[in-house]
């Protein structure tokens, strides 16, 4: 690393790969503090608001989302908002990016951001600044971005494709006290199985002798969840599931049987954004847009109404990962209950054309689209309850208490992806991991 930092090569990138417990966090925390003392400029980035908050806490330095730093909103256009790659006005700055396994490079059709390829845009932005370089860090055993087989930002060949000189380091030795941590012991075993491509039988989870990993029968779930909520709070407890359908069942049960919430939406409800939204933050400096996966807490529910065959609510939200930033939005209630990640395409289209009919008197298509862009119902925020989420949604975050429900498992589900899923879920927990209704044959 010292060679990279002292090198005069501006086209170099440092790739720091490390598994759970190998000291990545401590190393980068020390690096950031040292750079500060040497008055060497650094900027910390992460793919999501929650990941940026976690990064900032352990580095003792402000951290931002990648999108916040590298994109800027284009001036008013006829279509919906677009963000272009920003000009990098910094000089001789090291950009340190955590949780790089989450950085996608699949060109997303209809993406509002730059080329739609986040890694391409990040590299273009950083190296357009005089003397600026990139340090990418992450864990290759974690889930790759949705739709990709591997995490492109953690592979040297992908980075060499930009004409960059890649300096890579792999931290493999576990330095945290593995003997005392069942989470770490099992996570290390899982990533060894992934590395050896030994993913053809259900992995045995070692529980005996460890205080931080517990098997939880279904009949103790409500009492244990309740105890975690009372002791550590809603924001330090999460249920991780394999599907949105399963997460829905949990969310419904938690709200009814533990939190005693009778209304569809109550003050204090914990929500997760289900789809990027650019409308409600257009005039706000604190957030450029509301990203898919961000968490929000309901501060006030004012009124609900039914229109176009959908249900909406005027709600004040607080975003805990953005210094409790408060925002008033119109929210689509229907997505709270769908088994899909957000409103299904057919329903989205139905909403679009229903709202469009309101502007049928406007004959110029461009003017009609302007009206759609400014319509609070078409732009209603799509959310889900956030007491239980899928593993992709939990990635980048950490909680004191993680309840893991892997659902019914058979050999046909055994793929490297399942092992990455399990590894990613295990490493979300900083305190206790509860294995809910785990099959006896998988426990040792």
Placement of each model-derived feature along the sequence:
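Amphipathic coiled-coil/heptad-repeat helices and related helical stalk/stem segments
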Residues: 1, 28, 81, 115-119, ...
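ASCE P-loop NTPase helicase motor core
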Residues: 13-201, 206
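Short, solvent-exposed amphipathic alpha-helical segments in soluble enzyme
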Residues: 60, 254-258, 419-423
């Amino acid at each position: 690393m010292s060679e990279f930092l002292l090198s005069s090569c501006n086209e170099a990138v440092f790739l720091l790969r490390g598994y759970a417990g190998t000291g990545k966090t401590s190393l980068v925390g020390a690096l950031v503090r040292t750079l500060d003392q040497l008055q060497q400029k650094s900027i910390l980035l992460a793919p999501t608001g929650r990941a940026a908050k976690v990064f900032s806490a352990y580095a003792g330095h402000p951290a931002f989302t990648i999108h916040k730093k590298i994109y800027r909103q284009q001036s008013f256009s006829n279509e919906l908002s677009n963000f272009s790659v920003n000009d990098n006005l910094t000089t001789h700055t090291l950009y340190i990016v955590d949780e790089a396994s989450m950085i996608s490079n699949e060109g997303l059709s209809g993406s509002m951001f730059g080329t739609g390829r986040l890694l391409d845009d990040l590299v273009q932005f950083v190296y357009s600044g005089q003397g600026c370089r990139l340090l990418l860090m992450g864990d290759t055993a974690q889930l790759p971005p949705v739709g990709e087989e591997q995490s492109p930002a953690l592979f040297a060949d992908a980075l060499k494709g930009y004409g960059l000189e890649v300096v890579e380091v792999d931290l493999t030795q576990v330095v945290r006290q593995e003997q005392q941590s069942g989470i770490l012991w099992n996570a290390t075993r899982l990533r060894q199985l992934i590395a050896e491509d030994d993913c053809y039988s259900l992995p045995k989870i070692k529980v005996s002798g460890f205080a931080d990993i517990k098997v939880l029968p279904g009949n103790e779930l409500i009492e244990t969840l309740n105890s975690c909520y009372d002791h550590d709070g809603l924001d330090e407890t999460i249920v991780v599931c394999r599907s949105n359908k399963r997460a829905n069942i949990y969310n419904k049960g938690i709200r009814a049987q533990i939190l005693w919430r009778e209304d569809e939406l109550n003050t204090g409800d914990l929500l997760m954004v289900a789809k990027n939204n650019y409308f409600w933050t257009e005039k706000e400096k604190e957030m450029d847009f509301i990203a898919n996966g961000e968490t929000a807490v309901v501060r006030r529910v004012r009124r609900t109404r039914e229109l176009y065959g959908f249900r909406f609510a005027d709600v004040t939200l607080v975003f805990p990962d953005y210094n409790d930033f408060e925002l008033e939005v119109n929210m689509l209630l229907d997505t709270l209950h769908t088994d899909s990640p957000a409103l299904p395409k057919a329903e989205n289209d139905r909403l679009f054309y229903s709202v469009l009919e309101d502007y049928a008197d406007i004959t110029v298509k461009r003017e009609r689209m302007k009206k759609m862009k400014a319509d609070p119902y078409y732009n209603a925020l799509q959310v889900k309850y956030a007491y239980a989420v899928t593993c992709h949604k939990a990635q980048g975050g950490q909680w004191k208490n993680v309840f893991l429900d892997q659902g019914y498992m058979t050999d046909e589900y055994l793929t490297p992806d399942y092992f990455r899923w399990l590894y990613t879920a295990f490493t979300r927990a900083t305190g206790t991991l509860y294995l809910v209704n785990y099959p006896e044959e998988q426990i040792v």
